[in-house]
Amino acid sequence: CGMVSTANYIGPVDDTDIFFSPDRIKAQLIWFTSGALEWRITKHSVTMPLKEMLISFEACSEVPCHRNDHKSDITMWINDVEVGTWTSPGDFGERRGQLNPPFWPLKNTQYGIWTSWRIDDKGTFFNGRQISSVTMQQLNIPSHPYISLKIGVKKDAKNVGGINLFGE
């Protein structure tokens, strides 16, 4: 596991304490093998009832250095409801990512796939294709004090291939 900013590594690699570092907010790339990251999103500016959620991010699998054919099952949960799983086809390298800092070695992961997740009254969709029947109503957003968004890799997934998350 690890994380980097635009300027340097944030703490030592393979030390989970970095996830509690105040510098974590500077991360531009986060990687780990299994587990999940959680974001707690305020509902103060949300008009209820919420009809749909759109969540987008760049991600790929994780393996030391990179391997373009290294699959990983990446799952999303909202308010602890599993909304769907996407199988990333690989951990991509060999050409420099557009926003990677100069210190980041070319042998490492360079870029991911832009993913778009939509949850509405018909189900959950990944890049326009339905991946589950979980709807907005099942997320029970009005009864929670915030919206919990988790992205990760289950320890018992078919393809436990880690995750790289790119961006702010």
Regions found by a protein language model. Name each.
Residues 116-122, 150-158:
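Short beta-strand-plus-loop segments that form exposed binding edges in beta-rich domains
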Residues 1-106:
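Mid-protein regulatory/catalytic core that forms ligand/cofactor-binding pockets
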Residues 44-47, 141, 157:
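Hydrophobic beta-strand core residues of beta-sandwich domains
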Residues 57, 145-153:
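Short, hydrophobic/aromatic-enriched beta-strand segments in well-ordered soluble domains
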Residues 154-168:
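Proprotein-processing/basic-patch segments
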Residues 65-69, 95-97, 128-136, 165-167:
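Low-complexity, polar-biased intrinsically disordered regions enriched in Pro/Ser/Thr/Gly
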Residues 107-142:
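Beta-sandwich interaction modules
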